[in-house]
């Protein structure tokens, strides 16, 4: 029973309530499961559940997570990293490897041994409903390089990587969670596109591959999902391509894995050559079916024992021979480390892509001669994009929402007529391009910023053709919005390259480099500053306010050409009439008091004539 149980990796909700724990404990005690796949939850609860299950299991279990873009894909309160499509825009693959190391570090903190990543699907279908942002792009070479860099980073920390979805889910127009998608390409095309990233991954000797619930007639005409096909899993993956690592099924509860009522999906998957049965809908029933299939000679006992031995070998590789429970104290702080924040910011800043820049309008110049407005489509006024734009100039902000009436939309466009430059942030494709927007593009200097899949640009094709500039941020996260705004004003340089083609507009590989011309706004970690040290500033300012050393102030810290701290406190006078803000204007005399004194204090300090604790008086 234990040998059969090692093949099962059941899905687990990270909840510590009695009903959930009883169900999971039953799997541990009755069928001796070899692993668990955690669903959505929070870090501390998942760690507590992990510890309880591992303590109950005689053989330590492999703990896995579907974390394609890090722990935040499943765990709340963790650092949000970009999805693969955005990473596909980054030129520096060494940075992708460093990112893999950071995800691996976080997995180890959580007691996770397997991350079901990277997604090695080549997304060559603009209508793909399930891959899209999960893919590194449409170029199989680039997908290979970035996927391998990510896997190398993961495995350097002791985490087992699992590439997916073999033999390739990138050119499908259906979702295998709901049905059985069909990949209709011939073998030559499969070899040069879909299979190429997996071949490279296998050559480099990584740990695992997930077989997809896909029907690929060129590989097996029996209408079986690839995950249930001996021709795909055994003959192609293991024998022809030489893969010797762990073969995982995709989740067996998915509709793409449905079989005849007389066929058991776990038995079918093992007959095909898979090693680990991932997330079966009925684990105990499937365990019984596998056991009966062995007794009846349908499944070969020696083959099952070989799979069990392979799993135990990888458990050793993952460090389970020296298992330690997860330390829950301080877990959140360890996960959300300064380095994690730096990594998220760095990935976002490196990916922002400029697709069009007529008359080199970007970065925007001569701000004193232009009236600038920001229009948000699909998001409200005052979002992170518009806030960051406002750090560089006085910006009039407008928005159009899904519920905006035709009259409200026209009113917004009428107001925009008096501005010279209009920066339009597109946050959804559910609001179609309007005639008024095309007219604005023809009359004004229109700068687009898309916070969507690249393919969404084609919905705005006519106005894009007339626009002055197009910036692609790929996602609508706060960091993506902030760095897109900085590219527009020159706070950072644009370095990204488009990872997929946008039909009728831009080819994959398009990317216009722009210059850094102004101070940027970055995380302290990006320039080697300790954010904890910056927190002390607030207490120093508060002490000064309490002692009435000043009624208010603004503190700005810049290092290496970027602003890492900018906050305002108090009022202009002791009557508390006008608050100090980031846009407050000071006369030269006010600035010289601080600047002149500071230089004298610095010199006296260097000459050991003065300490920072001394009073000027």
Which residues make up each language-model segment?
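Second-shell residues forming the walls of enzyme active-site clefts
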Residues: 36, 44-61, 71-73, 138-303, ...
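Preference for extracellular/luminal or secreted protein segments
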Residues: 1-27, 239, 260-530
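Short glycine-enriched loops at secondary-structure junctions
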Residues: 12-17, 63-73, 113-123, 163-169, ...
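Active-site-adjacent structural elements in enzyme catalytic domains
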Residues: 43-60, 91-111, 299, 304-309, ...
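Short helix- or helix-capping micro-motifs
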Residues: 617
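N-terminal hydrophobic targeting/anchoring segments and the immediately downstream early-domain regions
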Residues: 1-80, 419, 424, 444
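Short, conserved catalytic-motif segment at the N-terminal edge
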Residues: 526-588, 609-614
């Amino acid at each position: 029973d234990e040998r059969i149980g090692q093949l099962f990796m059941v899905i687990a909700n990270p909840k510590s309530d009695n009903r959930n724990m009883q169900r999971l404990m039953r799997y541990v005690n009755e069928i001796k499961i070899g692993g668990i796949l955690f669903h959505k939850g929070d870090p501390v609860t998942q760690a507590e559940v992990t510890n309880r299950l591992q303590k109950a299991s005689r053989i330590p279990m492999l703990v896995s997570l579907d974390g394609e873009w890090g722990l935040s894909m499943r765990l709340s309160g963790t650092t949000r990293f970009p999805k693969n499509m955005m990473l596909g825009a980054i030129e520096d693959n060494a940075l992708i490897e460093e990112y893999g190391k950071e995800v691996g570090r976080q997995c180890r903190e959580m007691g996770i041994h397997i991350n079901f990543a990277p997604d090695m699907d080549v997304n060559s279908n603009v209508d793909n409903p399930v891959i899209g942002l999960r893919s590194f792009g449409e170029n199989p070479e680039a997908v290979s390089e970035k996927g391998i860099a990510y896997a190398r980073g993961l495995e350097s920390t002791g985490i087992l990587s699992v590439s997916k979805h073999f033999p390739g889910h990138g050119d499908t127009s259906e979702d295998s969670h709901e049905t059985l998608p069909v990949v209709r390409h011939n073998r030559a095309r499969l070899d040069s596109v879909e299979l190429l990233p997996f071949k490279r991954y296998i050559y480099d000797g990584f740990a695992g591959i997930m077989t997809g619930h896909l029907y690929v007639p060129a590989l097996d005409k029996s209408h079986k999902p690839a995950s249930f096909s001996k021709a795909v899993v055994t003959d192609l993956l293991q024998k022809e391509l030489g893969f010797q690592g762990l073969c995982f099924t995709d989740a067996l509860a998915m509709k793409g894995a449905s079989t005849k009522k007389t066929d058991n999906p776990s038995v079918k998957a093992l007959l095909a050559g898979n090693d680990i049965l991932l997330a079966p809908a009925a684990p105990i029933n499937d365990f019984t079916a596998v056991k009966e299939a062995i007794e009846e000679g349908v499944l070969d006992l020696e083959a099952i024992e070989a799979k069990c031995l392979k799993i135990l070998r990888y458990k050793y590789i993952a460090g389970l021979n020296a298992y330690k429970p997860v330390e829950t104290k301080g877990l959140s702080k360890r996960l959300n480390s300064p380095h994690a924040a730096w990594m998220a910011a760095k990935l976002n800043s490196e990916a922002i892509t400029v697709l069009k820049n007529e008359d080199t309008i970007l970065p925007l110049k001569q701000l004193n001669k232009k009236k600038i407005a920001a229009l948000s489509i699909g998001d409200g006024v005052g979002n992170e994009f518009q806030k960051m734009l406002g750090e560089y100039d006085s910006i009039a902000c407008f928005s159009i929402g899904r519920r905006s009436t035709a009259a409200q939309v026209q009113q917004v466009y009428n107001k925009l007529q008096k501005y010279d430059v209009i920066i339009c942030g597109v946050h959804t494709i559910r609001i179609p391009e309007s005639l008024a927007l095309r007219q604005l593009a023809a009359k004004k200097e229109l700068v687009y910023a898309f916070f969507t899949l690249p393919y969404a640009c084609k919905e705005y094709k006519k106005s894009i053709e007339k626009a002055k500039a197009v910036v692609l941020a790929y996602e609508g996260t706060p960091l993506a919005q902030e760095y897109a705004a900085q590219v527009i004003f020159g706070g950072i340089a644009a370095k990204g390259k488009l990872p997929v083609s946008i039909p009728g507009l831009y080819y994959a590989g398009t990317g216009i480099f722009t210059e850094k011309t102004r101070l940027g706004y970055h995380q302290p970690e990006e320039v080697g500053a300790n954010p904890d040290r910056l927190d002390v500033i607030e207490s120093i300012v508060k002490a000064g306010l309490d002692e009435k050393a000043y009624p208010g102030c603004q503190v700005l810290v810049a290092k290496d050409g970027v602003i890492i701290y900018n906050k305002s406190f108090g009022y202009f006078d002791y009557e508390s009439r006008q608050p100090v803000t980031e846009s407050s204007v000071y006369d030269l005399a006010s600035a010289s008091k601080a600047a002149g004194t500071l230089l004298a204090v610095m010199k006296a300090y260097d000459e050991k004539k003065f300490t920072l604790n001394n009073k000027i008086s």
